[in-house]
Amino acid sequence: MTNVKTSSLGFPRIGLNREWKKSLEAYWKGNTDRETFLKEMDEQFLAALQTQLDQQIDIIPVSDFTMYDHVLDTAVMFNWIPDRFKDINDPLDTYFAMARGTKDAVSSEMTKWFNTNYHYIVPEYEKGAQYRVTRNKPLQDYQRAKAALGTETKPVILGLYTFVALAKGYEQQDIKDIYNQMTPLYIQVLKELEQEGVKWVQIDEPALVTASPEEAAAVKEIYQTITEEVSELNILLQTYFDSVDAYEELISFPVAGIGLDFVHDKGKNFEHLKAHGFPKDKVLAAGILDGRNIWKANLEERLDLTLELIQRAGVDEVWIQPSNSLLHVPVAKHPGEHLADDLLNGLSFAKEKLLELTLLKNGLVSGKAAIQAEIDEAHGHLQDLKQYGAATNSAFAEERGKLTEEDFKRPTAFEERLRIQNDSLGLPLLPTTTIGSFPQTADVRSARQKWRKKEWSDEQYEAFIQEETKKWIDIQEDLGLDVLVHGEFERTDMVEYFGEKLGGFAFTKYAWVQSYGSRCVRPPVIYGDVEFKEPMTVKETVYAQSLTSKKVKGMLTGPVTILNWSFARYDLPRKEIAFQIACALRKEVEALEKAGIQIIQVDEPALREGLPLKERDWDEYLKWAAEAFRLSTSSVEDTTQIHTHMCYSNFEDIVDAIEDLDADVITIEHSRSHGGFLDYLEQHPYLKGLGLGVYDIHSPRVPSSDEMLTIIEDALKVCPADRFWVNPDCGLKTRQPEETIAALKNMVEAAKQARGKLAQTV
């Protein structure tokens, strides 16, 4: 008889009411002292554990909780602290400086965590650095949990292979030296856990899903060394987000258990298990519930899958768990949520997913009959959800059938469009602009709340938005920016705003997830066909344009980003959902153009994050992603300039796809890449319009004009000056007005100096 246990890989940090976010931001602003802040963090750490205990989960993780980011935690634990922060003597100040920067030191780079919408702080390797264990965070967290709750937990550590794969600053020939230097440090951390009496530790190695057999063999040597030194501690080697290509090598690792994703593996992990078996002396930790989407599980289907897994594996012990950490879904259904019952009953957040695991364990141990009532209830809820979505599933089929090849491309080549647009727009060399949003101050947020609570009328709220828009149009003109934006004061979120105005979307009030640091988002829920209802941005954009003789950009979010930043329906291919969104946006683009807007920006910051983890799957995704963008934008006249924006990505992977978008101008987050993208452009020139961010908007630091001039001049060594734009990294929504104005003033001055130097060379 196989012993079945429930396990959690990780739990959301932010709290049901975003208590974590509020504590962080109050501390950063100086509104709470350190003692209060640390006390609040400890309370939230314990609350997350208690929630998992309350769902009767057998094996609960610790050390997944963090004060900013778990990758940053790992870097700091092993003293991967860049030299520019070494003069900061306080450990907590150093930690936050690496994440957020200081007036003297730029923050570490931030990028996507695999193909999710979570962002991690990129570890920086520095040759000759003395790495050491600064503190054993997993041990401290284990001790805190045991002392406060009296329970055994499973410390979670980011594995060495994945940590190095996520880092930057090293050459290929450095990797062996890094492993040799870091392996004893991992052993030290694990040895201390072993001495404390810890029974299990979860070592996360998601990067192993893309490892070749040769790479996996090298990683196996690391674990051989570790387990020889730490023989009494049970190690669970955890993978997720896809299947493991080097499966045969993986199952030979000298560890006590292996975690596999049986949700996002496209069936491959199960195929591997059936073909090659599973070691009888290891625990199989089976990811059977979707940890990245919010739909209620089909309990009967999941039960049948798990029974077959148990039968095929033939092991003594199986852990059933989510496919990955529940970091990527909301904490729990909030009692104040306002969704229709048929939709709400079809959803399952982190807390509910753990309850589903407990139900499944009961079914596995006591038989299906023991949970038949719950199976029937879940089936009924899923049927109700399907019927709820079906109410919108009518309009798109006819429109999809009418699409032709011509709808997916602009009729005129870029070089000719560039000539026409240069004549039409009359912009200076190195035009300056921003990415779209301006600071959403307390006044802006308060006005929105008053409007939503019906304390303000629509007319009052619109008057306020127009007042803010006019204020920032005037500020932009005073600063000397060349292409202006209306500021997006009416928008809470760049996806939510559009989804609220399109058919097929639903929005929650409390279903928050962490994006980066304290930044939380409420992803829309796509439950039916997406449908254009009426213009969404025309009124605000046209009003802004009426206030200035300079060009004002229309600002839209692209179809792939809306898809990737939403919880998407599970009954349609993602490509088809993207095309539905694209058709709706196409109508909005046409409405903006008809209203006289000559520059329209369709942002795709999330294009790369949807990239499959395995390179062999990239072409298919990138093909339809580019098609969806072009479907949104290709119906405009040659005089209309299409911009797009991307952020937080390794762009080298997708340059061909960026070219395939056929946008006239692309602006890209650049300042945190520390010059890496320029090195790529030197070898692979990009000849369409390009704006590389000249300062980091995620940090309160205001860089000097000289710093920005250096970035511009470096960029002009590899980018044609006649098609280069000057802009910040991203939107300025989260910054304060004073620092925004100061930074933009320096940016405009840097552009003027660069133009002057170019004029002298002509």
From Swiss-Prot:
Gene of this entry: metE
Residue positions binding Zn(2+): H645, C647, E669, C730
CDD domains: CIMS_C_terminal_like, CIMS_N_terminal_like
Organism encoding this protein: Bacillus licheniformis (strain ATCC 14580 / DSM 13 / JCM 2505 / CCUG 7422 / NBRC 12200 / NCIMB 9375 / NCTC 10341 / NRRL NRS-1264 / Gibson 46)
PANTHER family hit by this protein: 5-METHYLTETRAHYDROPTEROYLTRIGLUTAMATE--HOMOCYSTEINE METHYLTRANSFERASE
Reactions mediated catalytically: 5-methyltetrahydropteroyltri-L-glutamate + L-homocysteine = tetrahydropteroyltri-L-glutamate + L-methionine
Physiological role: Catalyzes the transfer of a methyl group from 5-methyltetrahydrofolate to homocysteine resulting in methionine formation.
UniProt enzyme class: transferase
HAMAP family to which the protein is assigned, alphabetical: Meth_synth
Any Gene Ontology biological process: methionine biosynthetic process
Keyword Transport: no
Cofactor note: Binds 1 zinc ion per subunit.
EC number, as in UniProt: 2.1.1.14
Pfam family, one: Meth_synt_1
InterPro entries: Cbl-indep_Met_Synth_N, Cobalamin-indep_Met_synthase, Met_Synth_C/arc, UROD/MetE-like_sf
Residue numbers annotated as active site: H698
NCBIfam families for this protein: met_syn_B12ind (TIGR01371), PRK05222.1 (NF003556)
A GO molecular function held by the record: zinc ion binding
Pathway(s) it belongs to: Amino-acid biosynthesis; L-methionine biosynthesis via de novo pathway; L-methionine from L-homocysteine (MetE route): step 1/1
Binding site for L-homocysteine: I435, G436, S437, E488, D603
Keywords from the named record: Amino-acid biosynthesis, Metal-binding, Methionine biosynthesis, Methyltransferase, Repeat, Transferase, Zinc
Alphabetized Gene3D superfamilies for the sequence: 3.20.20.210
Sequence positions that bind 5-methyltetrahydropteroyltri-L-glutamate: R18, E19, W20, K21, K112, R519, C520, W565, E609
Cofactor(s) demanded: Zn(2+)
UniProt name for this protein: 5-methyltetrahydropteroyltriglutamate--homocysteine methyltransferase
Annotated residues for binding of L-methionine: I435, G436, S437, E488, D603
Similarity remark: Belongs to the vitamin-B12 independent methionine synthase family.
